[in-house]
């Protein structure tokens, strides 16, 4: 059963999806948002955030601010996984675990999924030394011995960046 037609559907409620939702809501665009996990779930897992203007501390702290802003702006979020998005005439039909939704436009902000390194004991170092982004976290390892593990050119580019920190 289709609930109603929306002007825009936003898939993913990380920083990109939240920003899009805030701007659209401010312009009185009728939106519906979908997030299969919790709002800003990846952000909340960050150990330390020191590169986001106006926010200091943990990723949990930043995620808390994001959630407060979503609530303050009364942004509707359906906690459900989007299974299929299909164009049907002038509307997109969005199928979720909760049902079907129609929207005139769709913004996809699903982010990325990091590959597991598949190193024994990797889980025990989460938030305690394993990082997946030299630009994001490199400063945390300034003047320390580190190892870079990766695939092809990406690992080389990250290692070169870390040389200058």
Q: Each predicted region: which residue ranges?
A:
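Short glycine-/small-residue-rich flexible loop motifs, especially phosphate/cofactor-binding loops
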Residues: 21, 40, 67
């Amino acid at each position: 059963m289709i609930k109603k037609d929306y002007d825009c559907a936003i898939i993913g409620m990380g920083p990109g999806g939240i920003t899009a939702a805030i701007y659209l809501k401010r312009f009185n665009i009728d939106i519906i948002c979908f997030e299969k996990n919790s709002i800003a779930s990846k952000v909340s897992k960050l150990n330390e955030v020191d590169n986001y203007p106006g926010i200091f501390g943990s990723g949990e702290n930043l995620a808390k601010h994001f959630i407060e802003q979503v609530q303050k702006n009364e942004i509707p979020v359906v906690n459900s996984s989007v299974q299929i998005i299909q164009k049907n005439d002038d509307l997109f039909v969005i199928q979720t675990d909760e049902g079907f939704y129609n929207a005139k436009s769709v913004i996809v902000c699903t982010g990325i999924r990091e590959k597991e390194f598949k190193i024994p004991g990797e889980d025990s170092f989460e938030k305690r030394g394993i990082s997946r982004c030299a630009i994001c976290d490199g400063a945390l390892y300034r003047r320390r011995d580190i190892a870079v593990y990766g695939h092809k050119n990406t690992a080389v580019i990250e290692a070169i960046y870390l040389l200058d920190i």
